Design a protein with these regions (language model features):
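Sec-dependent signal peptide recognition
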Residues: 15-22
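Sequence/structural segment immediately N-terminal to covalent heme-attachment motifs in c-type
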Residues: 33-58, 77-84
Length: 115
């Protein structure tokens, strides 16, 4: 899909992404985080992600992150992008700061699917 094209850059990246996606399948269908952590993650998305993707997530330095723009994106791939960044782009990895469940919560949030 078009939204995922930057992921294909860099040798060895697609196989690693596929392996990590398989590992994410073991996590719940809806990422579970505490209400307090969910509030912290929402703040992180609006402040940190918004600094590149626009405060309304409609795009800026980074691509738009609205539910409409991510309609074709699957949550596992989005979570991997959050965790590992996009090599060769300004998108940094957040794995040192977030768990896989938190990255899935962010993916659900961006797609408008959080409980």
């Amino acid at each position: 899909p078009r939204w995922m094209r930057p992921c294909a850059k860099g040798p060895g990246w697609p196989p690693m992404r596929s392996l990590a996606a398989l590992m994410l399948l073991a996590l719940p269908a809806v990422a579970e985080v505490s209400p307090n952590r969910a509030a912290e993650l929402e703040h992180l998305v609006l402040q940190d992600c918004g600094s590149c993707h626009g405060l309304t997530m409609k795009g800026g330095l980074g691509r738009p992150l609205t539910p409409e723009a991510l309609a074709e994106a699957d949550r596992d791939s989005l979570a991997l992008i959050v965790l590992d960044g996009l090599p060769g782009t300004a998108m940094p990895p957040w794995r040192p700061l977030l768990t896989e469940a938190e990255a899935l919560w962010i993916a659900d949030y961006l797609k408008g699917e959080t409980p």
